[in-house]
Amino acid sequence: MVYISTDYVFDGQGETPWEPDCKDYAPLNVYGQSKLGGELAVAQTLEKYFIVRIAWVFGLNGKNFIKTMLKVAKNHPQVRVVNDQIGTPTYTYDLARLLVDMMETEKYGYYHVTNGNLPFRTN
């Protein structure tokens, strides 16, 4: 089974990236709590699973932060965004390819999946 989760299972207050098997959960909202509940249910029920935590997803279709910022930049002389968030964007095409590759293995467990190694700050 593949369960798509989120970085929202953590509180975002760490100084270093969380390891995939980290159990220091601290969801800050209902979305994070519900995804954590799903993760725990999968891990307690199944032996063979991929729990894949993703963040800042963007792609060609649908709404996302990058498209929104491009639209704002076209229509406004100045763009303002929060500057207290750090994350690593995840491109949908790359995520889909990785998920297909993962399912062809038996390397079950928890995974943090984003593009690149360095976090992206919104300022």
Please place each PLM-identified region on the residue numbering.
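Mid/C-terminal beta-alpha module of Rossmann-like enzyme folds, strongest
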Residues: 98, 105-123
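Hydrophobic structural elements of the Rossmann-like NAD(P)H-binding subdomain
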Residues: 2-4, 52
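Short glycine-/acidic-enriched loop or helix-start segments at secondary-structure transitions
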Residues: 12-14, 61-62, 91, 122-123
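Tryptophan-centric aromatic hotspots in well-structured domains and transmembrane helices
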Residues: 18, 56, 65, 108-111, ...
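Histidine-centered beta-alpha loop that forms part of the nucleotide-sugar donor binding/catalytic region
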Residues: 5-7, 84
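Residue-level signal for the nucleotide or nucleotide-sugar donor/cofactor binding architecture
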Residues: 29, 87-90, 120
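NAD(P)-dependent short-chain dehydrogenase/reductase
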Residues: 40-87, 93-94, 100-101
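Catalytic helix-loop patch of NAD(P)-dependent Rossmann-fold dehydrogenases
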Residues: 9-52, 57
